[in-house]
């Protein structure tokens, strides 16, 4: 029950008090009339309505909690996923490429696991990315490091870090870094082969396979615009199976930056977690995008595989 207020004793009003009350009343009467006149101005009325629509849109966006409206979470950051796989119908993308029996996808889908790469391995492989990216970095929000080709984001361009830095690279990386990289790749390759019922030896590491570091800095070039929806098989013809190993944690290390499978009705999202592996067939059945990162820094490594040995690349070697 609300506490009762004791009524204040009113003092008798003199002429001065009455005049002050009349002036105050006049000001109050004038204020609504001034507001009314302002709203009668077309430009201000339009601006006010526009602000109302913007506010409504922002509230709706906040309530949905996703860039693309309705979304279902395939894997939450806080859960440990032993193994989750969803089969989806294969697209026709693979028909326009040379087929390899026992490898080219006939069973398509997407999977997530948190038990293939340990958190400790994820921390160690992230340190490899941090060491390499410390040599450069994009002016925009997305930087890449490709240990295979040597590509490194520097400003608005890319350099070959092996040629650009020469022997100094041996003071940045170690043989252990490259051994760990190879072991992580092998574990991911075996996971994909098992999930899709194919031989691991039929999968060939392909390009581009690279580290990514994303923050909230405004894009400076098209390479920084990582958030557009795309199909890997269309963007990179060599891709048959795509995987992502996350090296940082959603809502701990960064905000936004969730991975989204684009579907009619409801997108399927994967919330990054250090050590989490997300993998999928690379055709149009898995159209996807990444949310813009709103704060913090998101680290991941994209590891791609092809069924075509002509598109294969070797593991990077310590220089």
Curated annotation (Swiss-Prot):
<keyword id="KW-0408">Iron</keyword>
<dbReference type="Pfam" id="PF13640">
    <property type="entry name" value="2OG-FeII_Oxy_3"/>
</dbReference>
<keyword id="KW-0472">Membrane</keyword>
<feature type="compositionally biased region" description="Basic and acidic residues">
    <location>
        <begin position="18"/>
        <end position="34"/>
    </location>
</feature>
<keyword id="KW-0479">Metal-binding</keyword>
<keyword id="KW-0560">Oxidoreductase</keyword>
<dbReference type="InterPro" id="IPR005123">
    <property type="entry name" value="Oxoglu/Fe-dep_dioxygenase_dom"/>
</dbReference>
<dbReference type="InterPro" id="IPR039210">
    <property type="entry name" value="OGFOD3"/>
</dbReference>
<feature type="transmembrane region" description="Helical; Signal-anchor for type II membrane protein">
    <location>
        <begin position="43"/>
        <end position="65"/>
    </location>
</feature>
<keyword id="KW-1133">Transmembrane helix</keyword>
<keyword id="KW-0847">Vitamin C</keyword>
<feature type="region of interest" description="Disordered">
    <location>
        <begin position="1"/>
        <end position="34"/>
    </location>
</feature>
<dbReference type="InterPro" id="IPR006620">
    <property type="entry name" value="Pro_4_hyd_alph"/>
</dbReference>
<dbReference type="InterPro" id="IPR044862">
    <property type="entry name" value="Pro_4_hyd_alph_FE2OG_OXY"/>
</dbReference>
<feature type="binding site">
    <location>
        <position position="298"/>
    </location>
    <ligand>
        <name>2-oxoglutarate</name>
    </ligand>
</feature>
<comment type="similarity">
    <text>Belongs to the OGFOD3 family.</text>
</comment>
<dbReference type="GO" id="GO:0016705">
    <property type="term" value="F:oxidoreductase activity, acting on paired donors, with incorporation or reduction of molecular oxygen"/>
</dbReference>
<feature type="glycosylation site" description="N-linked (GlcNAc...) asparagine">
    <location>
        <position position="215"/>
    </location>
</feature>
<dbReference type="GO" id="GO:0016020">
    <property type="term" value="C:membrane"/>
</dbReference>
<dbReference type="GO" id="GO:0051213">
    <property type="term" value="F:dioxygenase activity"/>
</dbReference>
<keyword id="KW-0325">Glycoprotein</keyword>
<dbReference type="GO" id="GO:0031418">
    <property type="term" value="F:L-ascorbic acid binding"/>
</dbReference>
<feature type="binding site">
    <location>
        <position position="230"/>
    </location>
    <ligand>
        <name>Fe cation</name>
    </ligand>
</feature>
<feature type="binding site">
    <location>
        <position position="288"/>
    </location>
    <ligand>
        <name>Fe cation</name>
    </ligand>
</feature>
<keyword id="KW-0735">Signal-anchor</keyword>
<keyword id="KW-0812">Transmembrane</keyword>
<feature type="domain" description="Fe2OG dioxygenase">
    <location>
        <begin position="207"/>
        <end position="309"/>
    </location>
</feature>
<keyword id="KW-0223">Dioxygenase</keyword>
<feature type="topological domain" description="Cytoplasmic">
    <location>
        <begin position="1"/>
        <end position="42"/>
    </location>
</feature>
<feature type="topological domain" description="Lumenal">
    <location>
        <begin position="66"/>
        <end position="319"/>
    </location>
</feature>
<dbReference type="GO" id="GO:0005506">
    <property type="term" value="F:iron ion binding"/>
</dbReference>
<protein>
    <recommendedName>
        <fullName>2-oxoglutarate and iron-dependent oxygenase domain-containing protein 3</fullName>
        <ecNumber>1.14.11.-</ecNumber>
    </recommendedName>
</protein>
<feature type="binding site">
    <location>
        <position position="232"/>
    </location>
    <ligand>
        <name>Fe cation</name>
    </ligand>
</feature>
<feature type="active site">
    <location>
        <position position="298"/>
    </location>
</feature>
């Amino acid at each position: 029950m609300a506490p009762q207020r004791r009524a204040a004793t009113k003092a008798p009003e003199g002429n001065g008090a009455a005049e002050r009350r009349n002036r105050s009343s006049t000001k109050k009467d004038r204020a609504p009339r001034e507001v009314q006149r302002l709203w009668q101005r077309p430009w201000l009325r339009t601006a006010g309505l526009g602000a109302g629509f913007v506010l409504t849109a922002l509230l709706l966006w906040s309530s949905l909690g996703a860039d693309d409206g309705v979304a279902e979470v395939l894997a939450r950051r806080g859960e440990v996923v032993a193994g989750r796989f969803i089969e989806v119908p294969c697209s026709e993308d693979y028909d326009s490429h040379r087929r390899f029996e026992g490898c080219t996808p006939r069973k398509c889908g997407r999977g997530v696991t948190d038990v293939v790469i340990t958190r400790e391995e994820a921390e160690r492989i992230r340190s490899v990315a941090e060491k390499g990216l410390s040599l450069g970095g994009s002016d925009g929000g997305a930087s890449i490091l490709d240990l295979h080709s040597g590509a490194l984001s520097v400003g608005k361009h890319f350099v070959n870090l092996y040629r650009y830095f020469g022997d100094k690279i041996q003071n940045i990386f170690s043989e252990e870094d490259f051994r760990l990289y190879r072991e992580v790749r092998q574990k991911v390759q075996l996971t994909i082969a098992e999930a899709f019922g194919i031989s691991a030896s039929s999968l060939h590491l392909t390009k581009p396979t690279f580290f990514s570091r994303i923050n909230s800095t405004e894009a400076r070039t098209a390479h920084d615009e990582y958030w557009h929806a795309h199909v890997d098989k269309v963007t990179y013809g060599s891709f048959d199976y795509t995987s992502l190993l996350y090296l940082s944690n959603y809502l701990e290390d960064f905000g936004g930056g969730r991975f989204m499978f684009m579907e009619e009705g409801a997108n399927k999202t994967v919330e990054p977690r250090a050590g989490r592996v997300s993998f999928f067939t690379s055709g149009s059945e898995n159209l996807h995008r990444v949310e813009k990162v709103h704060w913090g820094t998101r680290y991941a490594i994209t590891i791609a595989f092809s069924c075509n040995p002509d598109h294969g690349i070797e593991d990077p070697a310590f220089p």
